[in-house]
Amino acid sequence: MENDVRNTPQKLYVLGHPVAHSKSPVMYNAVYGKLGFPWEYGLMDCATPVEAKAFLAARDFLSVNITTPYKPEALAAATARAASAKLAHGANILVKKGDALIAFNTDGRGCVGYLERTGFSFDGAKIAICGTGPTALAILHAAAIAGASEVLLLSRDKERARDALDRYVDEFGTLAHATVDLQAAVDGHRSFLTAYDETTFKFGSYTTSTQAITAADLVINATPLGMREGDPAPFDVSLFREGQRAFDVVYAHGETAFAAGAKAAGCTFADGGGMLVAQAVATVQAVCDVSGIDCEFSFDELFEVMANAAGFNV
């Protein structure tokens, strides 16, 4: 199968709306070209869920990356789902293998992996995450696996945050207490059972958890706020404090209100460009693994090729 897939033209896409700003095509085309694969990666902008579902149902691709707002639809289209996608309730990668369509979510791994590259340690850290969608849940899970002592899930509506967190914790507990403990994919990270037992999971709203936001070692915006001009930050940016780390999953949309507030407060800030590259590396590795291809490049080598292609200084 490796030779069939590796040596024949394949179609790969990023699916979402909007996607015109996406750096994915230039990154993936660069790395697949470097690997010598005759694969073509392009944009698939579907304005409605009906269009997105029809595209996924046609399966005219080897792999698809999925961005806002179609991660739940991608999960539903899959015939097999990795734990990362199940727990996030959304997939950001679909890979075809025969009649199967396999779902993964590398958003959390990408976010944590990039921040660790910048020197941030999740071990014992308190993390506040804005949002309750698949990206936020994927990051919440990855932060727990990476060693966070406390993870706070935030929303405008406290009950919405409660519901999302309760559902995640219930599902995480089921997986963590499976017959075989799921080990971490990265050296130094925790197994599912250890992360489940040793992480304190909390929920709140932007108005009821103000002290917790200020006390957090790292505050992450995992909402779409900032993708449109004039979008506010998720919370009152006066809650930022000097010395905090702040991370915004949004990139390539100018300076967001979240970013401006974090910088003004003296936080160490990074946008989603580095996360995009790190989760893209994980995507390449997943596609190669499912396709039975031995990828001869290391994580760092793939990261460098893709970051340079996108013009990211990360």
State the predicted function of each range:
Residues 179-270:
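Rossmann-like adenosine-cofactor binding region
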Residues 148-172, 178-193:
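NAD(P)-binding Rossmann-fold cofactor-contacting core
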Residues 5-6, 122-123, 145, 235-244:
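Short, conserved loop/helix-junction motifs that constitute active-site signature segments
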Residues 145-150, 264-268:
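Conserved S-adenosyl-L-methionine
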Residues 16, 103-108, 123-148, 155-158:
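Glycine-rich adenosine-cofactor-binding loop
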Residues 2-120, 253:
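Phosphate/diphosphate ligand-binding glycine-rich loop within oxidoreductases
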Residues 11, 40, 126, 149-150, ...:
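Residues at the starts of beta-strands that form the adenosine-phosphate
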Residues 245, 249-314:
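Adenosine-phosphate binding glycine-rich loop
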